[in-house]
């Protein structure tokens, strides 16, 4: 069994973004036709009791408060969170680590590049490596997600490289192949994928998606130039390291023949019209077989 909780579904800045009066953010703030969302993160478990966090969003404290499954019970302090797995070193994937600094043991997993980016920033020393050990992920090699007591959780994790880029704060050092990861998690029978950032959909990614049972995929933008057209930013989706949902080479087109998995769009930017519940774009992706992620959504992959 694999249980999944969507802790957050939005891209960096959240929905609504704190400084935005764009139509989507106004709709979310006033609760008129669009639901607010925190920044993208998942919780996964094999038993519904011990959980692993996929990306530590800046909203992680509130996400934990809003998720009873992540509440500690019993002793004065503790947590059912066993570990955190990072897909990249972007600010909206790592900032929440600082919320977990209260001398609480858990395992922190990421690529060599991401763990080095954390090591290069002394603020993350607040997570004492003696208490929060760093575990480098070896690409394309399955590893058991271990509970804090040293017992296997029942989940196997495989990290794989996907096209992307270095975080904005680290771009001067250039990009490495392990800057952006996809995660495959299996209980031996069912498999889920988490790919919240992807600059190009390769044939390998299509093969992985076709074989999976549940897929969370990059839904940042509807079209590559939408932020430019809206006057929100001079950056395109490609400049930010993201394919766009409805463009040629995007997930709607590339995964049309992938009929096995349930497909969920996550990491959705506040400019994306699929966030409007009655928009034509929302109807288009739903007709194409996609679910638009919302905070608090739960999924279960049952083992036969």
Curated annotation (Swiss-Prot):
Q: Does the keyword Transport apply?
A: yes
Q: Mind telling me which SUPFAM superfamilies this protein's record contains?
A: Metallo-hydrolase/oxidoreductase
Supply the InterPro entries for this chain.
Answer: Metallo-B-lactamas, PQQ_synth_PqqB, RibonucZ/Hydroxyglut_hydro
- Keywords assigned: PQQ biosynthesis, Transport
What Gene3D superfamilies does the record point to? Answer: Ribonuclease Z/Hydroxyacylglutathione hydrolase-like (3.60.15.10)
- Origin: domain of life: Bacteria
Query: What family does this belong to?
Result: Belongs to the PqqB family.
Q: What is this protein called?
A: Coenzyme PQQ synthesis protein B
Q: What is the lineage of its organism?
A: Bacteria, Pseudomonadati, Pseudomonadota, Alphaproteobacteria, Acetobacterales
Q: Which gene encodes it?
A: pqqB
